[in-house]
Amino acid sequence: MSFRGGGRGGFNRGGGGGGFNRGGSSNHFRGGGGGGGGGNFRGGGRGGFGRGGGRGGFNKGQDQGPPERVVLLGEFLHPCEDDIVCKCTTDENKVPYFNAPVYLENKEQIGKVDEIFGQLRDFYFSVKLSENMKASSFKKLQKFYIDPYKLLPLQRFLPRPPGEKGPPRGGGRGGRGGGRGGGGRGGGRGGGFRGGRGGGGGGFRGGRGGGFRGRGH
């Protein structure tokens, strides 16, 4: 099972009525409304966090400047072309919004969350750096920060317990997934962020094409 959302929302990058659709309106972030088994990240619900269009949510817009406070997001692992790969170390494994600004401790913005991959409770993210930043300028385990309002609890993406009622979980964030390396890009069975195509297990699979599947390199 993969990180496939459902409903009318999700993470729309380009328009249409929802889904984690990166430009069109048909092949979108699919899935069931009410959760299900397997410990995967399932989207759902209305809204979501789009890059442009959709039904509202965290849309890409003009930067509003640094937040009032920042909290720890993760640590630098290694560069990847012009981006950087980091280990997520948020409190309680909270998940950052896609495209959320990433800061140094002094609130200087270095870039934005670009991809997420790894296991559900042990995941990584890449940062698309700002034009004035160089991937080679960061040190191993250097810490990065985020606006606490740009984080969602992991529970938003887990299956709902049997018998629990309420709106579908998900509709939260995602990342393009896809595999930038890091300490465990694919992960084993049982749930996680997968960068490759096909395979068993489940969780954050990223990339182009229909659904939130692997982008490859």
UniProtKB/Swiss-Prot annotation:
One of its GO terms (cellular component) is chromosome, telomeric region. Residues 1-65, 156-217 are annotated as: Disordered. GO terms for molecular function: box H/ACA snoRNA binding; RNA binding; telomerase RNA binding. Residues 4-57 are annotated as: RGG-box 1. It is found in: Nucleus, Nucleolus; Nucleus, Cajal body. GO terms for biological process: snoRNA guided rRNA pseudouridine synthesis; telomere maintenance via telomerase. Residues 1-22, 30-59, 168-217 have a biased composition (Gly residues). Belongs to the GAR1 family. Required for ribosome biogenesis and telomere maintenance. Part of the H/ACA small nucleolar ribonucleoprotein (H/ACA snoRNP) complex, which catalyzes pseudouridylation of rRNA. This involves the isomerization of uridine such that the ribose is subsequently attached to C5, instead of the normal N1. Each rRNA can contain up to 100 pseudouridine ('psi') residues, which may serve to stabilize the conformation of rRNAs. May also be required for correct processing or intranuclear trafficking of TERC, the RNA component of the telomerase reverse transcriptase (TERT) holoenzyme. Interaction with SMN1 requires at least one of the RGG-box regions. Part of the H/ACA small nucleolar ribonucleoprotein (H/ACA snoRNP) complex, which contains NHP2/NOLA2, GAR1/NOLA1, NOP10/NOLA3, and DKC1/NOLA4, which is presumed to be the catalytic subunit. The complex contains a stable core formed by binding of one or two NOP10-DKC1 heterodimers to NHP2; GAR1 subsequently binds to this core via DKC1. The complex binds a box H/ACA small nucleolar RNA (snoRNA), which may target the specific site of modification within the RNA substrate. The complex also interacts with TERC, which contains a 3'-terminal domain related to the box H/ACA snoRNAs. This is H/ACA ribonucleoprotein complex subunit 1.
